[in-house]
Amino acid sequence: MNRFVIADSTLCIGCHTCEAACSETHRQHGLQSMPRLRVMLNEKESAPQLCHHCEDAPCAVVCPVNAITRVDGAVQLNESLCVSCKLCGIACPFGAIEFSGSRPLDIPANANTPKAPPAPPAPARVSTLLDWVPGIRAIAVKCDLCSFDEQGPACVRMCPTKALHLVDNTDIARVSKRKRELTFNTDFGDLTLFQQAQSGEAK
């Protein structure tokens, strides 16, 4: 099981502090400054959406240059290897991969890019992925758990309500055990007598 960041929508206040922290941290390390997570809002609650670091990682499967790999229990993307094909963004079932880029320094700002033909029409479902701007290289960006920072993900550290948590195998096993215990209590009654009996047998 990979590590990933999970959000508690009951604590999230939709302040976008996590997005700002993510953007600034990556910018300081020379990476694309686009936030690796996006706060989603509805009428009742809010919560950030970000990479789930899937076990099968469809984004890594479709990447033609192996820019996306599994490293230290997380799915990491090497921006320097990205060739802007956008297959990973199309393959991601959670829409957790965005594309960002900047104009190379040797291309003047007044280059004749406005005269270039517009991007060809695309289905609404993938239109944002297929949009392009002449002279700007689109780089895939996704949550990397701030692997370059010993303190861990900036979003987790900076969230004012502690709505974000980094979880790993141990955390998942503990929660799973607790859920099983609660289910047993619901179906078979109080566990206390059962646990006492088990303790007595052990003695």
Swiss-Prot record:
Cofactor or coenzyme needed: [4Fe-4S] cluster
Record: residues binding [4Fe-4S] cluster 3: C51, C54, C59, C92
Gene Ontology MF terms: 4 iron, 4 sulfur cluster binding; metal ion binding
Gene Ontology annotations for the cellular component aspect, listed alphabetically: formate dehydrogenase complex
Annotated Gene3D superfamilies: 3.30.70.20
Residues holding [4Fe-4S] cluster 4: C63, C82, C85, C88
Binding residues annotated for [4Fe-4S] cluster 2, in chain numbering: C22, C143, C146, C155
Domain 4Fe-4S ferredoxin-type: 2-32, 42-72, 73-102, 137-169
Source species, domain of life: Bacteria
Listed Pfam families: Fer4_11
Oligomeric form and interacting partners: FHL comprises of a formate dehydrogenase, unidentified electron carriers and a hydrogenase (isoenzyme 3). In this non-energy conserving pathway, molecular hydrogen and carbodioxide are released from formate.
Function: Probable electron transfer protein for hydrogenase 3.
Protein's name in the database: Formate hydrogenlyase subunit 2
The species this protein was found in: Escherichia coli (strain K12)
High-level lineage: Bacteria, Pseudomonadati, Pseudomonadota, Gammaproteobacteria, Enterobacterales
